Amino acid sequence: HTSSDANHPNEDYDVAELVSQIKSYTGNSRFLISLTDHNMINKSAYLKAIASNVNMIMGAELHIKLHDEVKSYHCHIFINKDITEDNIDAVNKILDKLYEDKLPKRDADTIPDIQDIINAFDGYDFMLLPHGSQRHGAFNYSIKKGETVDSAIYRSIYYNQFDGFTARSNSGLDATRNYFEKLGIGSFVNLITCSDNYNPKKYPEPHSDDAEEFMPTWMFAEPTFEGVRLSLSETSRLVYQHEKPERTSEYIHKVKLLNEHIDIDVNLTEGLNVVIGGSSSGKTLFVDSLYKAISHNFIGTKYSKYGVENLSVSNPSEMKPY
């Protein structure tokens, strides 16, 4: 957070101090941050950060109500937009309509529900990650004690709208996991940790004295919106610990084939790789031939006329695809 009162954004937020503290905390590792104030974007802080070449995602911490008879929960929204003055103004215009008061009481009638949020950001590429595990504002506490919920409806909401959840630490998640189990969701545990810090000089200390100790999230991906989204879909890319993790493992690096019929020149990355293409663009040819090349067995190939037997594969891992 940059502002203790989101209705009056802090124009003097010390971005340079925050960056200095993060670099010290991470041992000068590459990092990705989002300044998530309540229901608004602090334009001044974001533009100062971008001017300093900081890797950033535009984001805010929203109040969302499940239904009228319960308190709202907190939910981070991260938006895949270049951080420019015009883009920030456009997002703030939407947030101003949704939240005239940036710090509403959690039971205020004016707080939007999830469908209001989705409709308001129609046309944007965004992720929603509600609070989990924390003592306040967590979505698993946003129903009445003993309330019976329609599991099918709630499962649909979480599977279709939420990409993961946020907390200060990866500990104390039992209530969140138990809530998912009641809904029949067993694998929704993807977490991004957030500091809840308001004073950059004391980063990553939280606003509340009784909050859990902050546990940073280390991500094996590019420091971008897409890197976060990919990591949330593949939990092996996320590590929660204070020290920078060391991970060295080989993988399939490169696939190459060039002749009069075909030109393949593909660099692969560690972890999940996705082959995208239109109809008859060669997706199956590529994957099938890669498998056969690594297996050293082209018996039964349908693509001999393309010379796939000469496919060059750099595979120092010596792994064989399943």
Language-model segments: residues:
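Flexible phosphate/Mg2+-sensing switch loops adjacent to catalytic phosphate-binding sites
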Residues: 294-322
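Hydrophobic, aromatic-enriched interface-forming segments
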Residues: 105-148, 163
